Amino acid sequence: MENRNRNSRPIKNQDPVNEFIRAHQVLVIDEDKQNLGVMSKRQALEIARSKNLDLYQVGVQPDGTVITRIVNFGKLKYEQQKKSKEAKKHQTKIENKEIRITVNIGKHDLETKARKAKEFLEEGSRVKVSLKFRGREVVYLDLGQQTLNNFFELVSDVGKMEKEAKLNGKFLDMYIVPKKN
């Protein structure tokens, strides 16, 4: 562990740019993607500074030679952030919703819970149906299976079963996902 003063800030993970590249010899690629060959880090930094650009570590070759590129680091970082934001926009996030029922649930209550599950499925959420066994009700596993099957029949027009009912402790869990149109 590192010795640090209590009042000092934690050291940020620094990108391998310019002086922060930990190598004496580097393979340099210029801004036009031309290979300039292996040279000392100092020489490479001078070339980059003469063009008002930065020396950025791209990777390491199997023999240990550090591959660097002469780029505008601020612009590179901005482009990377832009790409990651764009990727996040197009990412679909599936939300998980849970509905709890019991073995001896009434018919109307089951229909009400199924109606709510249909709403969740129409929104595009994944629904976990948990049937809770209280006390010694676990011995009526077949009754629990039947209740979950009845529940699934009520929502089968908008959802499909992702995972079959499985006993997990005192819960019998089943997962339903929306049907693709």
From Swiss-Prot:
GO cellular component entries: cytosol; membrane
Presence of the UniProt keyword Cytoplasm in the record: yes
UniProt keyword Transmembrane helix present: no
The entry's keywords: Cytoplasm, Initiation factor, Protein biosynthesis
Subcellular location: Cytoplasm
Alphabetized InterPro entries for the sequence: T_IF-3_C_sf, T_IF-3_N_sf, Translation_initiation_fac3_CS, Translation_initiation_fac_3, Translation_initiation_fac_3_C, Translation_initiation_fac_3_N
GO molecular function per UniProt: ribosome binding; translation initiation factor activity
Source superkingdom: Bacteria
Gene3D superfamilies on file: Translation initiation factor 3 (IF-3), C-terminal domain, Translation initiation factor 3 (IF-3), N-terminal domain
Cross-referenced PROSITE patterns: IF3
One GO biological process term: ribosome disassembly
A Pfam short name: IF3_N
Family according to the record: Belongs to the IF-3 family.
HAMAP family: IF_3 (MF_00080)
Subunit text: Monomer.
Function: IF-3 binds to the 30S ribosomal subunit and shifts the equilibrium between 70S ribosomes and their 50S and 30S subunits in favor of the free subunits, thus enhancing the availability of 30S subunits on which protein synthesis initiation begins.
Protein name as catalogued: Translation initiation factor IF-3
